[in-house]
């Protein structure tokens, strides 16, 4: 898989209509009957970055595992990213957070485009997912306060149907606990679900090797 060919294919995929909600629902069918009232909820704005880079003659991207803490996304697998700060664009947020969390030099990051926004009800965030690339393999440096570990994923693994699995998950909410059968992506033996999985599924659909 030639790196430049993949990057070109990603650029070309952004010239077509995004798969959007249809791709999201494949990995989050429980969202189908949920109507999100953004005006009423006034969500916080966040950005993430799916960052492609060359490694060992292959194409990789990285995910991170959040540390354990008293919060909604404790121990979850996600992209580098975070809350939009006053005075910066959502694209700048994605680049800044990637630098702060995994140490990638902002100057080296090339943004290709933005995928479909994803609303996350438990934390009331509206996520703007960006795709970007590096010319060279990065030397990561994780911020231990925000990143438990960095997970490097070969892009070829993303396009195997065998990675789509499901498991029962129990959720704790103010209205009470409930259990759902939740689809997830099995990447590097990690359970990748929720907003991260729906963003990745849209990316899968955009490329479809």
Language-model segments: which ranges?
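N-terminal leader/linker segments that precede catalytic domains of diphosphate-processing enzymes
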Residues: 1-76, 83-100, 104-112, 118-128, ...
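Alpha-helix initiation/capping motif
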Residues: 1-2, 20, 140-143, 160
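NUDIX/MutT-family hydrolases
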Residues: 142-182, 186-188
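Non-catalytic surface loops within mature trypsin-like serine protease
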Residues: 55, 134-136, 155-157
């Amino acid at each position: 898989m030639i790196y430049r060919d993949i990057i070109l294919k990603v650029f070309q995929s952004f010239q077509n209509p995004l798969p959007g909600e249809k791709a999201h629902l494949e990995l989050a069918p429980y969202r189908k009957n949920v109507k999100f009232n953004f005006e009423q909820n006034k969500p916080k704005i966040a950005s993430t970055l799916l960052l492609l880079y060359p490694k060992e003659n292959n194409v990789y991207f990285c995910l991170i595992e959040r540390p354990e803490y008293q919060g909604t996304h404790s121990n979850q697998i996600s992209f580098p990213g975070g809350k939009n700060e006053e005075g910066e664009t959502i694209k700048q947020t994605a680049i800044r957070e990637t630098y702060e969390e995994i140490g990638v030099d902002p100057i080296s990051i090339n943004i290709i485009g933005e995928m479909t926004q994803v609303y996350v009800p438990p934390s009331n965030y509206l996520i703007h997912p960006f795709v970007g690339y590096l010319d060279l393999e990065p030397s990561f440096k994780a911020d231990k306060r925000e990143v438990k570990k960095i997970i490097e994923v070969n892009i070829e693994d993303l396009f195997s149907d065998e990675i789509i699995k499901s498991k029962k998950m129990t959720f704790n909410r103010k209205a009470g606990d409930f259990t759902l059968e939740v689809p997830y992506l099995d990447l590097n033996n990690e359970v990748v679900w929720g907003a991260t999985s729906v963003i990745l599924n849209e990316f899968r659909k955009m490329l479809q090797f």
